[in-house]
From Swiss-Prot:
One Pfam family per UniProt: F-box
Protein name: Putative F-box protein At1g53550
Domain F-box, chain residue ranges per copy: 29-74
Lineage: Eukaryota, Viridiplantae, Streptophyta, Embryophyta, Tracheophyta
Membrane spanning stretches: none
InterPro entries according to UniProt: F-box-assoc_dom_typ3 (IPR013187), F-box-assoc_interact_dom (IPR017451), F-box-like_dom_sf (IPR036047), F-box_dom (IPR001810)
Origin: domain of life: Eukaryota
Cystine pairs: none
Amino acid sequence: MRKRKQQVYNDNLIVSRSNKRSSTSGKETCYFDPIPVDLVINILSRLSLECIARCRCVSKLWSSIIRRPNYNQLFPVKSSATPRLLFVFKVARELFFNSSPQHFNPNNSSLVATSLQKTSSTRFSQLCRPVHGLICSQHIEENYLFALISNPTTGEYIALPKQRMEEMNSETIIEKVRYSFGYDPIDKQFKVLRITWLHRGSHEWSSEYQVLTLGFGNISWRNTQCCVVHYLLEDSGICINGVLYYPARLDNRKYTIVCFDVMTEKFSFTSIDKDMTIMTNLSFSLIDYKGKLGACICDHTLFELWVLENAEEHKWSKNIYNMPYSRSRLEETSYLKCAGMIASGEILLYPISSANTSTDARYPFIYYYNLERNIITRVTLQVPILKQFTYARLFYTFSNFLENVTLI
């Protein structure tokens, strides 16, 4: 019986076959015919998200196929197409990402969160909302401030070019830097907006605005112009239909909502309602309210919701809901922050620690608030990975998180 020998060239993933007799042994060695690239793509398209992530390391060819910008559109990965909840816990100097189903069973008041990936929190200071499965986080390392773009599902991350936090010259000092993260659905591009506050002299303030586009090759910051000096507040914003909305303070100390078109990289501004005084509150959140920008705050007794009905006309609608639970029933040691609205129309709320309190998140919970029925349901989270720690903090909760195999 003839022996068959398989030879694989890892660089090009071609498995060849030919009949060739050895001149020394007289034995015949068989090789396989090349596997068409289309067949390789077809095989990859049948794999799960986890398998796809591992297959990137098989060879350069497989990696290049999966890295194609339109790969996920041509061959949808068998990942969870259902939006999920994303929980970010901080343990010591690490951030742990966990996800769970977004909808809960009324007969079971708990959700089981599965562990995704973790990342070092090197003086972690801010986390932007997920955009198509990717997350932008802000970190400080020695005298440098930088952002990480990470994929909680695959564990892949990339550090963006750093900025040194020191004097730019003898008179200019960087006071603060904020990042926002958006996505252009037309050109299918992820972009990061960086706003730097500058202090010149004793009273002169200004801002610099830079944009970075994720993609192949070298990535770098480029300057963009904005005719109105503004300062990004603590909320990093939310991207809805290609527009990045974020709250800001103007040079005259008034507040506004900035609308940054991710594709054109142009700024516009929407005035807030004269009665809208919630933007500086700790529990202030921007949400996607049925495709419109929503701004909300929860003070344990009232839920205040503003919806931007028309950005050009600066028209807002206001709704006030009397919450059915008292402050004591809703964990008076913490503030409640809005994680977003899900398809069922329910608002998700989660506790965050105030300046004087600290909530142990090894036993986390969230609330589902049905606005129409005015019913709040408390749901506990089962997070097995947290059992190995003595203390953890729930930093963020996000709704409508979609797993993504996108490489960065």
